[in-house]
Amino acid sequence: MSQLTLTLLMIVAAYLAGSVSSAVLVCRMRGLPDPRSQGSGNPGATNVLRIGGASSAAMVLFFDMLKGALPTYLAYLMGIDAISLGLIAIAACLGHIYPIFFGFKGGKGVATAFGAMAPIGDDLAICLMASWVVLVLISRYSSLAAIITALLAPLYTWWLDDRFTIPVAMLSTLIIIRHKENIQRLLKGEESKVSRKKRPKTP
């Protein structure tokens, strides 16, 4: 099989994997409202945290990251070049954003993009996660943390393993474009902050 054919097959596989909406499935399994019609309307871990609590959000985060990590890492093991790895990672994110199995209404792609970047190295994964966590703790805005972390990701990659700077920059660009509406709401002071689902008070 030629390298081009293998790359195209992996792009299709990555898109299909990304199209499995972890947020919708976890919410169905746990008897929670559809995240596409509750909270922010975004089927991602942050919105599931709002409507279903930390454990449900953690499950969504794990599976969304896995959707990006698996196809990208498998393609890396197959010897696919760095730019093509970036295209495969983007395909996984596009599957998450526009899922064919869920009416093309998906999330922002942040966790899936992070999952695709994480196999580059533990040091990069730690830098990305630490940046996002610190920014959320400071600002309480998940979207702002994602945008700034996406801007930092190519710089971290260039510093730690410059072979993958261009693919990571491609992913970061997609994430920032996907957050266009969030950026507008942030500028207007209308963006929702991160909050947990409140537990009912016991009598």
From Swiss-Prot:
The keyword Transmembrane belongs to this UniProt entry's keyword annotation: yes
One annotated GO molecular function: acyl-phosphate glycerol-3-phosphate acyltransferase activity
Pathway: Lipid metabolism; phospholipid metabolism
UniProt KW Cell inner membrane keyword: yes
Entry GO CC: plasma membrane
Stated role: Catalyzes the transfer of an acyl group from acyl-phosphate (acyl-PO(4)) to glycerol-3-phosphate (G3P) to form lysophosphatidic acid (LPA). This enzyme utilizes acyl-phosphate as fatty acyl donor, but not acyl-CoA or acyl-ACP.
NCBIfam families per record: glycerol-3-phosphate 1-O-acyltransferase PlsY (TIGR00023)
Family stated for the protein in its record: Belongs to the PlsY family.
HAMAP family referenced in this protein's UniProt entry, alphabetically: PlsY
Name of the protein in its database record: Glycerol-3-phosphate acyltransferase
Organism: Shewanella sp. (strain MR-4)
